[in-house]
Amino acid sequence: MNQTRVFLIFAWLMVAALLWMEWGKEKAAANAPGAAATQSVPAARDLDAATPSAANVPAAQPIAQAGAPGTVPATSTTTATATATPAAAGAAPVVTLTSDVLRLKLDGRSVLDAELLQFPQTKDGTAPVSLLTEDAAHPYNATSGWASEHSPVPGVGGFRAEQPGTTFELAKGQNTLVVPFVWNGPNGVSIRRTFTLERGRYAISIKDEVINKSAAPWNGYVFRKLSRVPTILSRGMTNPDSFSFNGATWYSPQAGYERRAFKDYMDDGGLNRQITGGWIALLQHHFFTAWIPQNDQASLYVLNKDGPRDVAELRGPAFTVAPGQTATTEARLWVGPKLVSLIAKEDVKGLDRVIDYSRFSIMAIIGQGLFWVLSHLHSFLHNWGWAIVGLVVLLRLVLYPLSSAQYKSSAKMRKFQPRLAQLKERYGDDRVKYQQATMELFKKEKINPMGGCLPLLIQMPIFFALYWVLVESVELRQAPWLGWIQDLTARDPHFILPALNIAIMWATQKLTPTPGIDPMQAKMMQFMPLVFGAMMAFVPSGLVLYWVVNGGLNLLIQWWMIRQHGEKPSKIIRANAK
């Protein structure tokens, strides 16, 4: 297989993959339900009012000793009704908690709004990203509540801050902000909820203590959910947000990492599975929210829809709290960016998969390895653009033996091209005899006809994984390179890098030997630089920088290989010009 065919295979695979992704996005947009546009959406503060479905309420289990949680059965068929106690004086006031990285608005039961203070919405703007929001059209919040068959539980607005005031802020010199809330039920039952924010951390600790000072046992279970009306993204290669996975993901030690896109949310009948030691999350480009329960407590993991809203929920653990006893359950709520270093500090198995390099484990592992190298280069170079350049250089050095083997195979094929032409002329239209004679020649001269293609196939997973690393890494968001490139996740404003990419591809074509190429292939080759140039004009500049550096190094390697095998680059250029 000559260099031309190898290049065409790679080029058309790239085009086909991008067109396939584009077609899928357009089809999804065309078939997307219009519920968000046609149905009335309740106010954001009412989103958590619904209690879990009665068919899926886990039965409470007795506590062996004070503070020990019960287990959660897979699915309970017990008819359950939550007896929510209304707030004593209307809805609870909204309280604002502020750390150095988060500003939260909550009512004790739901986090209604969450701003990421270190991530502005735009490069030149000052407004931070709002991950959770009370937006009327697309509300998105996180809720933690209690449900029970017979015992009283707090309803919407049931929790009240123990301390006076509605604004609490992490002070300078402090590393922890602790804000307790309490619900005082009838007959001496109360639930004390404590929110803990830490400096530099996006995981919020939420601890519940059920204190039973009544004369009768109290039973109930905690539920934690993420509820969202998904935003319909503008589709196309010009919008990096639409490249990334948007939907629910969850993890269990048994099944590993799983995911469900918003557009396919209920295609497989939702989710209803008991899991211990997992987590559940909603993902979007660069950011995510997740409920992370205690590693030793079982929960029922549920995906369902509530009108226009997609819901990801944990139900359980369940408790039976004897008189005079206390039960405790704790969970973490992550509201923040997909920052590799901070996610690793949480020490949660599988949570690194929210950085969705691929749904396939092997591609995700390759992507994680590439980012590890990229981040170490950044720590040395202090610039993500130069880190991309350095990563490409390292990859080309590592893959140089494969590139060398590919060129050697192609050079050997060119050497025997006249003999192949003679065989074709000798056997004419007898394809069977021609193929037999060709294989005998390959065997005699020790030529591997796949030698030019195999190295490329080995390299392709690496380059595809690197593509997703550059798309997914929030570290590159709004990061500058130099000069006119001030945001590696935005397109090149002056189209300089796409123009360089066209020039490099054209030069590579001229330097690629093409003996025996047919006219159709020649015409296809002439248009490939323009096709790729048009595609690269509107994708993130970080990706184009990768292609330019990779193409430039490939051009230099091509020139070097030609010289190494005793050929003259000028002769090849003149031959291709004819």
Swiss-Prot record:
Gene3D superfamilies linked to this entry: 2.70.98.90
GO CC list: plasma membrane
InterPro entries recorded: Membr_insert_YidC, Membr_insert_YidC_N, YidC/ALB3/OXA1/COX18, YidC/Oxa/ALB_C, YidC_ALB_C, YidC_periplasmic_sf
Keywords: Cell inner membrane, Cell membrane, Chaperone, Membrane, Protein transport, Transmembrane, Transmembrane helix, Transport
Membrane topology according to the record: Multi-pass membrane protein
Tree of life domain: Bacteria
SS bonds (residue pairs): none
Membrane-spanning segments: 6-26, 354-374, 380-400, 451-471, 495-515, 529-549
Annotated GO MF terms: membrane insertase activity
UniProt subcellular location: Cell inner membrane
GO BP: any one term: protein transport
Self-association and partners: Interacts with the Sec translocase complex via SecD. Specifically interacts with transmembrane segments of nascent integral membrane proteins during membrane integration.
PANTHER family: CYTOCHROME C OXIDASE ASSEMBLY PROTEIN COX18, MITOCHONDRIAL, OXA1
Database matches in HAMAP family: YidC_type1
Record's function text: Required for the insertion and/or proper folding and/or complex formation of integral membrane proteins into the membrane. Involved in integration of membrane proteins that insert both dependently and independently of the Sec translocase complex, as well as at least some lipoproteins. Aids folding of multispanning membrane proteins.
Family: Belongs to the OXA1/ALB3/YidC family. Type 1 subfamily.
Name by which UniProt lists this protein: Membrane protein insertase YidC
